[in-house]
Amino acid sequence: LSGRLPMTSEIKAHLEIMRHRPDVRAIVHAHPPNATAFAVAREPVPKCVLPEIEMFIGELPMTPYATPGTRDFAESLVPFLRHHNAFLLASHGALTVGADPFEAYYRMETIEQYCRILILAKQIGGWTQIAPERVLDLLRIREKLGWPDRRVTQGADLCSPGVPPAGADRAGDMQPLIAEVVRRVLERLGRLPAGPREPGP
């Protein structure tokens, strides 16, 4: 690619990626709405749901928030570069890498479609994970294609959700408290019959 336009403001991040990953020749950084929805919610993207994701993307980690365009942003990617080709950027967007522009673009399109599928699935009852032993079959095929996955180890936890960045607010953790507060308010207003409280922890 060539041209006379100014360089991306994320040139520091691009150079840092290529310094740590000599195989990377193309980077796509975008803000697609569905993937970015997960990023701004800091909601870990579930694993073991769609075979195509396990085969062609693998884990989709979320990097910690850092100010765009800064050295901190570039360095926030480094711990994830060795094992991943696609990332959600907390409160920001998404980034994918590849051996050429098509591969990096394909990965971006794939994670955006996956996030869209997850959002739709949640609206009709949620998703069901594939059994870990079946996922392991997919990861072994992936390895044979030359795409090793660090989860193919003895006793690896294949399907647990990703971990959000340290300090991330998790609205989901508040749901039991919110439900209890709403129940008590409705009960006091006489709109809900008094009943036994659910046992606490």
Predicted regions span which residues?
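Glycine-rich flexible loops
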Residues: L1-A194
